UniProtKB/Swiss-Prot annotation:
Organism: Schizosaccharomyces pombe (strain 972 / ATCC 24843) (Fission yeast)
Record field: catalytic activity: [(1->3)-beta-D-glucosyl](n) + UDP-alpha-D-glucose = [(1->3)-beta-D-glucosyl](n+1) + UDP + H(+)
Membrane topology summary: Multi-pass membrane protein
Cellular compartments annotated: Cell membrane; Cell septum
Gene Ontology CC terms, in alphabetical order: 1,3-beta-D-glucan synthase complex; cell cortex of cell tip; cell cortex of growing cell tip; cell division site; cell tip; cleavage furrow; division septum; fungal-type cell wall
Function: Alternate catalytic subunit of the 1,3-beta-glucan synthase (GS) complex. Synthesizes 1,3-beta-glucan, a major structural component of the fungal cell wall. Required for the assembly of the division septum and maintenance of cell polarity.
UniProt-recorded name of the protein: 1,3-beta-glucan synthase component bgs1
One term of GO molecular function: 1,3-beta-D-glucan synthase activity
Keywords from the UniProt entry: Cell cycle, Cell division, Cell membrane, Glycosyltransferase, Membrane, Phosphoprotein, Transferase, Transmembrane, Transmembrane helix
UniProt EC number: 2.4.1.34
Chain ranges passing through the membrane: 378-398, 416-436, 448-468, 503-523, 546-566, 577-597, 1180-1200, 1237-1257, 1337-1357, 1440-1460, 1484-1504, 1515-1535, 1550-1572, 1678-1698
Gene: bgs1
Entries under PANTHER family matching the protein: 1,3-BETA-GLUCAN SYNTHASE COMPONENT BGS1, LYST-INTERACTING PROTEIN LIP5 DOPAMINE RESPONSIVE PROTEIN DRG-1
């Protein structure tokens, strides 16, 4: 298209049909100017740019729908050019921006004009961008101008009723005046908006700011100032004076200059004025009034035409402020999801209060089971209303904290607070009134009436606060009201769901809630009633501690009861998600049947109808001329699909002959007919299919889905010529473009056992065989060898074939090696695979265009070259492919060659990248450019391609996490009305691309509008635009093993099953790829993603939230799918899980969640919560419940150990006596525990239901059973448990510390054994510590109060501890195990004399810096750590997770230890033991000893430093090693001493060990938070501590304080090292039985990779020297391993078998030794009242 401009030299500037209107009143508004612009004469202003600056295609085929339409275009192409030239010259835009926007606008006009008249095309585009009902500019205009007496919008209108206009009247006036615009004026406004947008760089993320800039620019453009030659704006004024100052403010919020370099500021989101804060300043007129120039003059005080020039004078730093504080706090969830907490906690209170009457019954006696007065029971339940009011009041208070009052659109909170305080007091008053009455008064009828009224009033409060959005608690704003327009337009403009969708939504949630509340009552709370009755009345007798006395141990039943309540409440939250999953799965399946998406369609019927459906659903259009019989057209499409599969080596030469349409002689002489493949018509289609396609092959899957998808309801399509233009956009950073031959045929590293090519041949044997046959055929043709196929069959030439089957070629020429590289690249996650797949759109468009336009052959006179040119023109007109290669200018040589190969293979591929001005000096500010090239760009002398466009940027656009910035950089280069967002590891197929017309029809914009968008009729019939269209993904890694299949299953359920029903009920958001985006809707609202660093790490979903809040619809189509790669390694998958979990935590802090959570209607709010945040909250609650259950188990086990337990029959009378006398009735607690375990088991098991249902519906019962059986055999439930913990931990850690970032995950095959040290360091914090702590508790519970149900807990906790090693390839290979053990021991003791990042101490310091942070200034020594770190966490944020949580665990673990040592039943007070002192001594002793050892070796290092000199570095290694090993021995001795003091009772010792761990955990966190300053970025302090060399470490003046800080570090490090040493060896010892199993490595590989033994990966090949060395390593370290194993057994087990208590002997002078446990039955004392 750029050729057009070359022929325009010498043409004059355009003659406008409108004279520019010059207002005498400088305060005239821009709307008035838009309305009253008069015709202007031609401007004689000198141009900075003229038409000779451009190269645009002027041929007649350029933009044919616009230029060659039957109706004359309202503005010609030359006129658009002249408009752009004039705008550029007057407003100071860049030349290349103008050229790019010209093509952008013309392609957009051509796309619209292809299906409607040019006038309608321009009118609808103007309505979409500027003035329409759903245009963002019009909404911004009314939001920011309407609420101030219409002074801005309508001040100068002549109508006398202007001042009293309502919003409805104002909107009508707007529409009337928009309709009166001339086409030229509309084109000016559209072009100006896109010029402003195209050059805005990061300001594109602030759409309302862009609207304001556009308004100022337009005011200036239509003024006389713009025509004044002497006052002309300088070149590139817009970038330098308008955009760059705003960009620099954004940049300054994130970066500061330190030591001459930009480094990221250490600020959390609440301290950063981000894109949204900037944008919200422009939402109101009061905000606009705060925009001040440097001389403190408000910008709005200037005449409108002067504002554009003075934008460069604005002090943006003084204008912008925070409009929402994203404090890292759990309080956001209280506000955002207050209705969830009200609904659950209030309902739980109703249930619990009703079932706990004994707790508020005066003088309750268990034998009498006396009931409270009815009034008390009614009002006790009614207290739920106070709870609901209090929770909602807290939500409003936290809203006050998060939304500053300075923000002009902040709502008034005092009416809500007044209401809530009133209802709170009204709900508390009856409780006080009734319970303060005497027992006699409580039986009065008046009290009963008060109680009943209170109960129903509380019910009203609970229902109201559960259903009503927080922002609508007091008063409602009608749609016609002019109040608070900004919030209504930009945060709560929710599209109403259809009647069907609303009905389904309410039915779904009514079903879920009814099932949940019924099940929760009978299964959870009612079963707790017996436990409440017995524990509430339980009074332990004769128990005491020497120091604490009897008070604490007598409170043990109440403590246990409080844990039961808390655990039951957490489970009460869990089952809501359980029912949501179940019910939504059923609804989704039913909806799928309604849509026709099911494998249950008769198989023969399904394939029999494929030809007919190809014609009716893919080919036939209403305006199609019937020239050939449908069979001819069908055959072209079907043969193209089959041939594409053959070219991809999915089917063989034999199979392709069976599947193609063939031309055969007809019965009539001289005629031919088409014979359809028997595949369609055979009576045994399924048998035929299995013969043609191998079982579970890719070809069978694709054909099956294609046939099934055509059975669905697909929108009617238009012709290819009338199809909208669209773009595929792929962001690329460092993903592999094309595999090199070295990567394919060489092992990845020394830990790899297989080359990539060998592994691919194992995964795709059929496709490899087809590829080899094809290559051999090509080689035979080139070598003129005849009969090679026969020789192969006869086995004559096997030596000739060997190289082909080995590496895919015999001759290592580039064309053959490239074929192998491409074959491998098309089966891995490469960019080449993505481009090859999505280029099928171009092939599909050509195919469809040729079939529907048979006259093409006549037009081209049968010339195949001209025919191809015509097809190429149509494909390029309708489809563009753009890859945003951020690093293209800095590619390595190999990457550059691969990119060049892509451009040569796909010349129409466009690459957008960021370039730097080569002429910039070292001291000058760099000029960065956004550049676009394609395969047609000529290659310059420097080897690079000449850019089509090179637009200077205001600065580096990569300010966030990268991906969204990368997309934003390239978004001006997309073309057309829609864009498909694709990742660089996806694939697509020809048969799916053929559906593109139907997909674009889902946006409901194919038919021309019946009325002008500015007419009243259009307003009445208007529907909200479709903003996003979601699509299915097939995870092509599902057959690569268990982990790949799990990832595929999650995508299958989440991205398909739930997305289907969520789109119907209005709860679907933009999950990512391969969704289609409505370009005009999204780019005018901030783009396709958000980009604030950290906060928007999951950038894709924000596009959905933008669309949902701003009036867009989000749909989902099931009949189209493309391929998607997923991470295949354990660590890589969990990195992705961590990114999703931390991203969700950031979403919870965002204003989008605040807006949606506080404004969505009830049913859509529930869908939004449980489909997104609810999943992660559920994972967190599961793990919290698990921890609570372990605390219940140890507290219950402590009681079971030392008290007599009553016999229990569940159906005995409530007043039955307890037997034997003096016993404690604890059996009901065990019964309740059984049901809780069953509940959690069901919650975990329910995770497989969606996948099972999805498989059942789409692939059949047999495939469902096979797939689930393979997953269960592969131990995938264990992986799911571990994943659940990673989700929960990443969410909690991010809300505590922050640090969310984009995690680049691996996209290769996980065949390499990961070292134990790496796995341990990666997962110890998130899971191993947590799992081991709970496992110790469960071991105690299993010893003291065994239940068979505990087996489930053992599986769960074992999963948390061993999953990283269970899913590590070749983890249990004998030799590799001990070689790895050697590396692990080195890792433990490494970096005590030299800097080594891969070490235990390095990992320990890295974990610690989440709390302490790094020092900002670097002293003397080069930093070892990265410069861009997350900010130091605030102590108030860490209080809950790092202080309060461990403190609670400490309390609930120490209490049972004290109780188990309190000797219940022993009435001899003289025999009381000092259990409390014992616990204190055993807890403090390790801390004191670690401090002594650390200080001793510090002094030793200082003393040895002068003696040894430079050798002190080496000596430091031994000092550190001795100190660490010595403290390991100290920890073992402490455990032995504890066992001795506990009388060698293993259960009591174990419980004491658990309590000590809790104390140490709390102490370590407390010391680190309270006493440690920031870390240095180098490791000098650690090295200096052991070597004594404190000088020269780069401490500066801090050398005086650093030893004291390091002393605290070393005190905690020695404790943590001992814990890690013991825990890691425990985990290694657990693997001992496994590594001794013969052939375990093969069995393990079958589980992981699903490779049969005959196709197992071979063991690595080593040299003789390497084998000898490995045998020596195995001998040494196997000896060490088993020696430590025996030592652990002897020291930690045998003493408890043979030891005897020394209590009461002369050695027990201080009563520290616990006597043997004796359960005492007392016939005179009762444990219950």
């Amino acid at each position: 298209m750029d050729q057009y401009w070359r022929e325009q030299e010498g043409r004059g500037l355009f003659e406008d049909d409108a004279n520019s209107y010059v207002s005498d009143d400088d305060t005239m508004s821009s709307l008035t100017r838009m309305i009253y612009d008069k015709n202007s004469s031609r401007d004689a202003l000198h141009s900075d740019y003229d038409s000779s600056s451009f190269n645009v295609d002027s041929s007649s085929v350029a933009y044919p729908a616009w230029n060659q339409a039957g109706e004359e275009a309202p503005v010609t192409m030359e006129g658009v050019q002249e408009i752009l030239l004039d705008l550029t010259n007057k407003l100071g835009f860049q030349k290349d921006n103008m050229r790019n926007i010209f093509d952008y606008v013309m392609v957009l006009l051509d796309s619209r004009a292809s299906r409607m008249s040019p006038s309608s095309a321009l009118l609808t585009i103007h309505a979409d961008v500027i003035g329409g009902e759903h245009a963002n500019f019009s909404k911004w205009y009314f939001a920011s101008h309407f609420n101030d007496g219409h002074a801005i919008g309508f001040h100068d209108m002549s109508s006398p009723i202007v001042e009293t206009m309502t919003l409805k009247e104002a909107e009508q006036a707007w529409r009337d005046q928009m309709a009166a615009f001339s086409p030229h004026r509309m084109m000016v406004q559209v072009c100006l908006y896109f010029l402003c947008w195209g050059e805005a760089n990061n300001v594109r993320f602030v759409p309302e700011c862009l609207c304001f800039i556009f308004e100022c620019a337009y005011d200036y453009y239509i003024s006389s100032e713009a025509k004044d030659v002497d006052a002309a704006l300088p070149k590139e004024f817009y970038l330098d004076s308008v955009i760059t100052p705003i960009y620099r403010f954004i940049h300054a919020q994130l970066f500061e200059i330190l030591d001459g370099k930009y480094v990221r500021r250490e600020r959390d989101h609440s301290q950063i004025i981000g894109y949204d804060d900037i944008n919200q300043l422009f939402w109101s007129y009061k905000g606009l009034q705060e925009i001040m120039c440097a001389d403190k003059t408000p910008l709005l005080d200037l005449p409108p035409f002067m504002r554009y020039r003075h934008l460069s004078d604005v002090e943006w730093k003084s204008c912008f402020y925070k409009s929402y504080y994203e404090y890292r706090s759990w309080f956001h969830n209280v506000t955002n999801f207050s209705r969830i907490w009200v609904m659950h906690i209030s309902a739980y209170w109703y249930y619990s209060a009703y079932n706990s009457p004994n707790l508020y019954t005066k003088n309750y006696h268990i034998r009498l089971n006396n009931k409270p007065p009815a009034s008390c029971r009614w009002t006790a339940c009614g207290l739920a209303g106070a709870i609901a009011s209090f929770i909602t009041l807290a939500a409003v208070v936290f809203e006050y904290i998060h939304v500053p009052r300075r923000y002009h659109s902040a709502r008034r909170l005092w009416p809500s607070m007044l209401l809530l305080i009133s209802t709170l007091l009204l709900n508390i008053a009856p409780v006080v009134f009734i319970f303060a009455s005497s027992t006699k008064e409580q039986h009065y009828a008046s009290r009963l009436v008060v109680g009943i009224v209170h109960f129903f009033f509380s019910l009203v409060c609970v229902v109201y606060y559960s259903i009503t959005p927080l922002r609508n608690l007091v008063g409602f704003t009608t749609k016609r009201s002019g109040k608070n327009l900004a919030n209504r337009f930009f945060t709560a403009n929710f599209t109403p769901t259809s009647k069907t969708g609303a009905f389904v939504s309410w039915c779904l949630w009514i079903t879920v809630l009814v099932a949940k509340f019924l099940e929760s009552y009978f299964f959870l709370t009612l079963n707790l009633a017996d436990s409440i009755r017995f524990l509430g009345a339980m009074r332990p007798y004769d128990c005491r501690d020497y120091i604490l006395g009897a008070g604490l141990c007598k409170a043990q039943p109440k403590i246990l009861l409080s844990l039961l309540y808390l655990t039951d409440l957490s489970l009460f939250f869990l089952d809501t998600y359980l029912w949501y999953i179940l019910i939504s799965t059923i609804y989704s399946l039913a909806y799928a049947f309604c849509l026709g998406i099911s494998v249950w369609t008769p198989w023969r019927e399904l394939f029999y109808r494929v030809p007919r459906r190809i014609y009716t659903k893919l080919l036939y259009t209403d305006d199609m001329e019937i020239v050939f019989k449908p069979k001819v057209l069908i055959s072209q499409v079907w043969n193209a699909i089959i041939i594409s599969m053959y070219r991809e080596h999915l089917i063989s030469r034999t199979q392709i002959q069976e599947l193609l349409y063939h031309q055969v002689p007809s019965e009539k002489a001289g005629y031919h007919t088409l014979r359809a493949p028997n595949f369609f018509y055979s009576q045994q289609v399924k048998h035929y299919k299995q013969d043609l396609f191998p079982a579970n092959s890719e070809a069978a899957r694709r054909i099956s889905f294609f046939a099934q998808s055509l059975a669905e309801s697909i929108p009617k399509t238009s012709s290819i010529d009338a199809m909208p233009t669209f773009t595929v956009l792929v962001p690329h950073y460092s993903e592999k473009i094309l595999l090199s031959l070295r990567e394919i045929i060489r092992e990845e590293d020394q830990l790899s056992r297989v080359t990539l090519l060998e592994y691919l041949k194992q995964l795709y044997p059929v496709e490899w065989r087809n590829f080899v046959d094809d290559t051999k055929l090509l080689a035979d043709e080139n070598d003129s060898v005849i009969g090679s196929i026969d020789n192969e069959k006869n086995g004559v030439n096997k030596a000739y074939d060997l190289p082909f089957y080995c590496v895919g070629f015999k001759s290592a020429t580039p064309e053959y090696t490239l074929r192998t590289r491409i074959w491998a690249s098309l089966r891995t996650q490469t960019l080449y695979r993505t481009i090859n797949g999505f280029s099928n759109y171009s092939r599909a468009i050509k195919l469809l265009y040729r079939t529907e336009t048979p006259e093409l052959v006549e037009w081209t006179n049968g010339d195949p070259v001209r025919l191809d040119e015509e097809l190429d023109l149509m494909a390029n007109r309708k489809f563009r492919f753009c890859v945003s290669m951020q690093r293209y200018a800095k590619f390595t040589k190999e990457e550059a060659e691969n990119a060049e190969f892509l451009l040569r293979a796909y010349p129409d591929l466009q690459i957008a990248y960021m370039d730097e001005d080569p002429q910039s000096r070292h001291n000058d500010e760099r000029h960065l450019y956004s550049v676009l090239i394609d395969g047609h760009c000529p290659i310059m002398e420097n080897g690079k391609r000449r850019p089509k466009y090179r637009i200077r940027l205001s600065g580096n656009p990569i300010l966030g996490d990268g991906k969204s910035d990368n997309q934003n950089m390239s978004i001006p280069y997309i073309r057309g009305e829609y864009v498909q967002m694709i990742d660089a590891n996806q694939d697509n197929y020809l048969e799916e691309c053929l559906k593109i017309r139907s997909i674009l029809a889902e946006f409901e914009q194919l038919t021309p509008p019946l009325h002008s968008p500015y007419s009243v009729n259009a307003k009445a019939a208007d529907n909200h635009p479709v903003a996003i269209l979601g699509a299915r993904e097939y995870i092509f890694s599902e057959n690569t093993g268990m982990l790949g299949d799990v990832a595929a299953g999650k995508e299958q359920t989440f991205g398909t099953l739930f997305a289907r029903i969520l789109s119907l009920i209005g709860g679907k958001l933009h999950y990512g790829h391969p969704d289609f985006i409505n370009v005009l809707f999204m780019i005018t609202r901030g783009g396709v993603s958000k980009a604030q660093k950290g906060l928007h790490v999951n950038e894709d979903i924000y596009a959905g939230m933008i669309a949902l809040q701003r009036g867009g619809r989000i749909k989902h189509c099931d009949y189209y799918q493309c391929g998607k790669g997923r991470d295949l390694g354990f660590g890589s998958i969990l990195n992705f899980t961590t990114k999703i979990g931390t991203g969700m935590a950031e979403q919870m802090l965002s204003r989008e969640y605040f807006n949606l959570g506080t404004q969505l209607p009830f049913d859509r709010f529930l869908s939004f919560f449980y489909a997104h945040a609810g999943f992660h909250v559920n994972n967190m609650v599961i793990m919290f419940s698990l921890q609570l259950l372990m605390l219940v188990i140890i507290n219950l086990g402590a009681m079971y150990t030392v008290v007599p337990v009553c016999r229990y029959r569940q159906f005995d009378s409530l007043t039955a006596s307890l037997y034997p006398e003096g016993c404690y009735q604890l059996k009901p607690v065990l019964e309740w525990l059984k049901r809780c375990i069953l509940s959690i088991f069901i919650v975990f098991g329910i995770a497989f239901v969606p996948l099972a249902v999805c498989e059942l519906g789409e692939r059949g019962a047999i495939r469902m059973v096979i797939r689930l059986a393979k997953q269960i055999f592969s131990l995938s439930p264990i992986f799911e448990i571990f994943t659940c913990q990673i989700y929960a931990q990443s969410l909690i850690a991010n809300l505590t510390f922050g640090g969310a970032r984009y995690i680049g995950t691996s996209r290769g095959f996980a065949t390499v054994r990961v070292p134990f040290s790496l796995l341990y360091s990666r997962f110890s914090g998130p899971s191993l510590y947590f799992g081991s702590r709970l496992m110790y508790m469960l071991l105690f519970g299993s010893i003291t109060a065994w239940l068979p149900h505990y087996i489930y807990f053992w599986i769960t906790l074992t999963a948390l501890c061993i999953s990283p090693f269970l899913y590590n390839p070749h983890q249990f290979a004998w030799t590799d195990f001990f070689v790895d053990y050697r590396e692990f021991m080195r890792w433990l003791f490494r970096e005590n004399s030299r800097n080594q990042a891969n070490s235990w101490i390095g990992n320990c310091q890295l974990c610690r810096t989440r709390v302490t942070g790094y020092k900002r200034k670097i002293y003397g020594k080069k930093a070892d750590k990265i410069a861009m770190d997350s900010p130091r966490a605030r102590i108030t944020t860490m209080f809950y997770g790092e202080i309060l949580g461990p403190l609670g665990t400490l309390f609930f673990t120490c209490i049972p230890f004290l109780f188990i040592n309190s000797q219940p039943g022993n009435d001899d007070e003289t025999q009381s033991t000092n259990a409390f002192i014992r616990l204190i001594i055993m807890s403090v002793a390790p801390l004191v000893l670690s401090a002594i050892i650390a200080f001793f070796f510090f002094c030793l290092g200082i003393m040895l430093r002068p003696i040894l000199g430079d050798r002190s570095k080496t000596y430091g290694v031994y000092l550190a090693g001795v100190a660490h090993f010595l403290f390991v021995c100290v920890d073992v001795v402490v455990f032995e001493v504890l066992g001795y003091l506990e009388g060698w009772s293993f259960s009591k010792t174990l419980l004491g060990f658990v309590a000590i761990i809790s104390i140490h955990r709390f102490a370590h966190k407390f010391f680190i938070i309270c006493f440690l300053s920031r870390e240095f970025r180098h490791d000098g302090a650690n090295l200096a501590w052991w070597s004594g060399r404190w000088n020269g470490q780069g401490f500066g003046y801090m050398v005086l304080t650093q030893p004291w800080r390091e002393f605290v570090c070393k005190t905690t490090e020695l404790n943590m090292f001992a814990g890690d040493f013991l825990l890691s060896h425990l985990l290694l010892f657990l693997q001992a039985p496994v590594i001794l199993i013969p052939y375990i490595d093969k069995l393990h590989s079958i589980i992981l990779f699903w490779l049969v033994p005959s196709r197992q990966i071979r063991p690595p090949i080593y040299t003789i020297r390497q084998n000898k060395l490995r045998r020596q390593i195995v001998l040494r370290y196997a000896t060490l391993y088993f020696s430590l194993f025996i030592a652990f057994f002897v020291l930690l087990i045998l003493p408890f078998v043979f030891g005897k208590s020394a209590a009461g002997t002369s050695m027990d002078k201080f009563n520290l030794i616990q006597p043997a446990t004796k359960i005492v039955y007392s016939s005179t004392k009762n444990s219950s009242v």
